Curated annotation (Swiss-Prot):
Any GO MF annotation of the entry: ribulose-bisphosphate carboxylase activity
UniProt function note: RuBisCO catalyzes two reactions: the carboxylation of D-ribulose 1,5-bisphosphate, the primary event in carbon dioxide fixation, as well as the oxidative fragmentation of the pentose substrate in the photorespiration process. Both reactions occur simultaneously and in competition at the same active site.
Chain positions with N6-carboxylysine modification: K201
Active site location: K175 (proton acceptor), H294 (proton acceptor)
Self-association state and partner proteins as the record states: Heterohexadecamer of 8 large chains and 8 small chains.
Modified sites of kind N6,N6,N6-trimethyllysine: K14
Cofactor binding note: Binds 1 Mg(2+) ion per subunit.
Protein name per Swiss-Prot or TrEMBL: Ribulose bisphosphate carboxylase large chain
SUPFAM superfamilies to which the protein is assigned, alphabetical: RuBisCo, C-terminal domain, RuBisCO, large subunit, small (N-terminal) domain
Site (Transition state stabilizer): K334
EC identifiers of the protein: 4.1.1.39
């Protein structure tokens, strides 16, 4: 065995463990208009200085590694490195900090959410010096926004396609979510659409199981759509889930939906992946299909307050990847969602320009450069008594989705749909007349019950149903 010998290094290179602060902590840095900015909630391990920790985050999510390498001399680190340019303690929290990191735009492939996330949240979340790390927000620079196509159509084009204006849209997830045959599934869709809903929906885990293969479902649902349209004179849709085990299978299902002439399909964007989602969004844009996006698996990523990725980031990146609808929580239903936080990322989904507002969790001003907006979908444990709050919270540009709140009606699916449609139109009219739905919403619903027995029956069934749990993720 040859004994190891000490090697003397040249004057321009010295190996060893890096002190990240020397290179990546730059509090004097002036942010460029083209930089991608990130706000991380950071919890260092005991004894690790926060400046070293946030510099490590900037390094490991950009050009850095744990030691000096001789190839650093073959490029310009000053041009390509991420920089921690600000650090602030989190009020009321021990050993927690918000670290602000700026990334040069040239670090990222144009039009690729996949590459953006691979860099910014790829390895750094497993860094040993960190006890916990959460990506709270991203500022996507206008120069980078313009490399994305975004939603296939957007809110205004969707309204034009559907010829529906002046109110929110109504939907319903077909239940039970698994186990129905394709024919019975189509029957449930027809009854809901005939009763007055605009949309029905595949549940996120309905793909192509032995009890209901995807092609059979598509055919029976298309029949239900056309039959209900003929009877009501309204344009109807069903979110046909195109999510599949392969990208080829996904596009095959999208093509089948196009050939059947249905207006909208669906994708589970987190389980399906951003690359698949962007490809599907491009297909929908080219072939005139609306794209409904479900966020299945999001709570695995975003629910913990100290670690993961906040949903406002997932919502922003979905707008970039492409989708016309996105589930956003309800504030009042069974799923997690604080009011101000939810309204913050709803604005980031819909509006063209959103100012920084820390009271709503928005860390950066975001300019979308006229990229089409995404319609928020309120779904999960809502019923007719929630309608005044939903109209007051979300306004008109939202899809309000009642699954059990439609199919659980004691008289059946169609009366359940009637009850929701009557409640929505009553609340919309009351709001337009200047009434305060936050205070008078209950009276609006009770008044509408006098001329809608379907609504009266629904109100009686769900009069005591509440989901009163404290929100985990608070500002």
């Amino acid at each position: 065995m040859v004994p190891q010998t000490e090697t003397k290094t040249g004057a321009g290179f010295k190996a060893g463990v890096k002190d990240y602060r020397l290179t990546y902590y730059t509090p004097d840095y002036v942010v460029s208009e083209t930089d991608i900015l990130a706000a991380f909630r950071m919890t260092p391990q005991p004894g690790v200085p926060p400046e070293e920790c946030d510099a490590a985050v900037a390094a490991e999510s950009s050009t850095g590694t744990w030691t000096t390498v001789w190839t650093d001399g073959l490029t310009s680190l000053d041009k390509y490195k991420g920089r921690c340019y600000d650090l602030e303690p989190v009020p009321g929290e021990e050993n927690q900090y918000i670290a602000y990191v700026a990334y040069p735009i040239d670090l990222f492939e144009e039009g690729s959410v996949t590459n953006l996330f691979t860099s910014i949240v790829g390895n750094v979340f497993g860094f040993k010096a960190l006890r916990a790390l959460r990506l709270e927000d991203l500022r996507i620079s206008p120069a980078y926004v313009k490399t994305f196509v975004g939603p296939p159509h957007g809110i205004q084009v969707e309204r034009d396609k559907l010829n529906k204006y002046g109110r929110g849209l109504l939907g319903c997830t077909i239940k039970p979510k698994l186990g129905l045959s394709a024919k019975n599934y189509g029957r449930a869709v027809y009854e809901c659409l005939r009763g007055g809903l605009d949309f029905t929906k595949d549940d996120e885990n309905v793909n192509s199981q032995p009890f209901m293969r995807w092609r059979d479902r598509f055919l029976f649902v298309a029949e239900a759509i056309y039959k209900s349209q003929a009877e009501t004179g309204e344009i109807k849709g069903h979110y046909l889930n195109a999510t599949a085990g392969t990208a080829e299978g996904m596009l095959q299902r999208a093509q089948c939906a196009k050939e059947l002439g249905v207006p909208i399909i669906m994708h589970d964007y987190l389980t399906g992946g951003f690359t698949a989602n962007t490809s599907l969004a491009h297909y929908c844009r080219d072939h005139g299909l609306l794209l409904h996006i479900h966020r299945a698996m999001h709570a695995v990523i975003d629910r913990q307050r100290n670690h993961g990725i906040h949903f406002r980031v997932l919502a922003k990146t979905l707008r970039m990847s492409g989708g016309d609808h996105l589930h956003s929580g309800t504030v009042v239903g069974k799923l997690e969602g604080e009011r101000e936080v939810t309204l913050g990322f709803v604005d980031l989904m819909r509006d063209n320009f959103v100012e920084k507002d820390r009271s709503r969790g928005i860390y950066f001003t975001q300019d979308w450069c006229s990229m089409p907006g995404v319609m928020p979908v309120a779904s999960g444990g809502i019923h007719v008594w929630h309608m005044p709050a939903l109209v007051e919270i979300f306004g008109d540009d939202a899809c309000l989705q009642f699954g059990g709140g439609t199919l659980g009606h004691p008289w059946g699916n169609a009366p359940g749909a009637v009850a929701n449609r009557v409640a929505l139109e009553a609340c919309t009219q009351a709001r337009n007349e200047g009434r305060d739905l936050a205070r008078e919403g209950g009276n609006v619903i009770r008044s509408a019950c006098k001329w809608s027995p379907e609504l009266a029956a629904a109100c009686e069934v769900w009069k005591e149903i509440k989901f009163e749990f404290d929100t985990i993720d608070k500002l």
